[in-house]
Structure formats: C-alpha cells, structure tokens
Amino acid sequence: MAGRFAPRSARAALPHQEAAPAAGATAPSNGTPAVRAAEPTHDAPAVRETAPSQGTPPLRAAEPAQGTPAVRAAAPAHDTPPLTREWTPPGPLDLRLVLGPLRRGPADPTFRMVADGTFWRATRTPEGPGTLRVASRGDRIAAAAWGPGADWLLTGLPALLGADDDPDAFVPRHRLLALTRHRRPGLRLLRTGLVMESLIPSILEQKVTTDEAYRAWRHLVRRFGTPAPGPTADLGLHVMPDPRGWAMIPSWEWHRANVDAKRSSTILRAVRVARRLEEAATMNLPEALTRLELIPGIGPWTSAETLQRSNGAPDAVTVGDLHLPGIVGHALADHRDADDEEMLALLTPYEGQRHRATRLILLSGRTPKRRAPRMTPGNIVNL
C-alpha cells in the first residue's frame, strides 16, 4: 500500500495456441484488424487455449454456460453512442485522489488518466464488460459508459466516487492529519462494489516489489483479457479475464508473467468461488474479511487492500505491509522502526477510520528517508 500509487511487445503464439476463429466471428469495421491465432497485436489479446494445461484444477463455481467458445473475436466496431450521466457531488471532489487507488502502475491496461484530466476505467461488471469515462465539469461530474456493463457503471457512479463515504466521521487527533485533511478536501473513499478486480492484483502484489506485480498484471490482462468496449483502441484499455479465463491460463504463462506458484494457486482457488467472494462487497467489514480469508493464501494484508477498494471500508487498515508501519510510526511518533503492533496502537484514536488515517498520512508527505537500497525484483522467467 505504502509505495503504490511500456507495453510489452506482443509475443507470437505458441503452436498449441493456434486455433481457428470462433464460428461467426467476423472482422470488425472501422479498420480494426481481426484477431489471428498466431499473430497477436498490441490491441487484441492472443487467442487462448480451449482447455487448461495438465494439472490445472477444473473450474467449478464460475463455469459459463455449455457451448461458450474459448476463442474470442476482436472487439466490435464502436459506433454505438455511449450512455451518459451527470452527477453533482455534495462537496469538493478530487478525481485523482478518489480514483487513484484503482491504478495499478503507470501502464495499467484497465485504467488511464489522460492529459485533459479525464479518467478511463475498464472493468468487468455483473452485466458484462464496461468502460467508464469520468471528468470534472465545474462542480459536476460528467460520465459516459460503453458496453454491456454501461448501465451498471453509471448507476454505481456516485458510490464509486465516494457518495457513501462520510469524511466528517474522521476526527483528527494529530496536527499533521488535521492539516492534511484541510489541504485535501476532495479526498473521498471510493467503493467499486466489485471484489475480484481488486483481489486478483492484490494477490499479485504479495511479497514482491510493486514493479514486479504491475508487470505481471499488465502481461496477464493484455494477453488473456479482452479489448475494452468503446473508443479505447488508442488508450490500449483491456478488461481483465472473467473467472473462467483466469482458470484457463496455462502454468507456463504464469511463469512468463513472473508469478510464482503460490500466488497463481491462490488466484486459481479464488476464481473457483468468485461468486461467493463477490458477495463480500455488500457485507460489513468483519464479515467481508472473514469471507475473503477463508481462501488459503488470502490473509489480512490482501483482504484489507481489496476491501478498501471494493467496499470503501474506512477502517480496513493494511497490516503486514513492509513500509506502512514505519511511515505511520514516523509521522505520528517520530519512530520509523515501528511494527504492526505499534502502528495499530498509534491508530487507536482513529478506530473505525484507520484506513482514512493512513491515507492522510501518506498524502501528508511526511515519510522517513530511505536507509537501504530498494528491494531487488525477483525473476523466475528464466528458471
């Protein structure tokens, strides 16, 4: 949490991945090339296998209807006008601060912020893939959405931008936090209502550098996800795979993405019960934490990082982080060597708002100077 906030060139498909296009798939209009089995491009994912590799556990809870083809066609032409909505927030709103936690690195294929201050987000909703474009227009928020999930995204726009958050519930007990809150009046805690889209990248971030995790996320989403609906070709936006898509990723592709067996196995266990995990988005924090942590490999760090985004949980404090205890200790007690126990003790006055307190501490800029070299990224690709 403390440290987060180039496209890889396409690889030729392996021989086993060559397959005929799905029946009825045709080349889209407007000059978009059709997906070819052996020539993946930057704008379209490589054709996936129709069966998992040997040893990959079968998918149970998230199996699609019988007859669903594994091979996907290229994104269709986008001449359908988007659905639109305007919303007026009840107070100051800084889109960068609110939406920033959704961004997994500068080249996240599911998230973009462009030069004019517009934010783009590609996601997989309960209604299907969707793309959301959000921009500030004075005191209003203007949004447009494309794809099967467009209506779902626009309906959830206020919650996404923190309409359900109550920043006044936070009472600063330290001058640093009082000043930071005053300087950042547009901070709201977002709520996506989607668990898996935050859970999977959080699992990828376990025990590795953020650069390693971001690289793995980019590789897997671009290769096995789908082009985002709407006018997104120039942005390179992709929607992450559905649960079956994650389960179908061969073991060697996890290896190429530099994801070890422990993390990939955790993701595979999670996607098998994706529907049950998504139910956590409507639960109170203790019940939601329990639901996620029933999956082996998902602990307090991963569940907190997920529910901060999916549920907008103001008390979902991140424990087990390499840097956060020292940052909190330095900011509140001038003790940069604090551990989780000391961090939680310092955050006791903010019970119920501990996640918000840590966000404000990180935004304050009061962080200890680095004393040691950065953690060296691991690399299992050539093993």
Model features per residue range: what roles?
Residues 1-36, 72-383:
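HhH-family (HhH-GPD) DNA N-glycosylase catalytic core used in base-excision repair
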Residues 25-27, 31-39, 43, 49-51, ...:
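Acidic, glycine-centered low-complexity repeats within long intrinsically disordered regions
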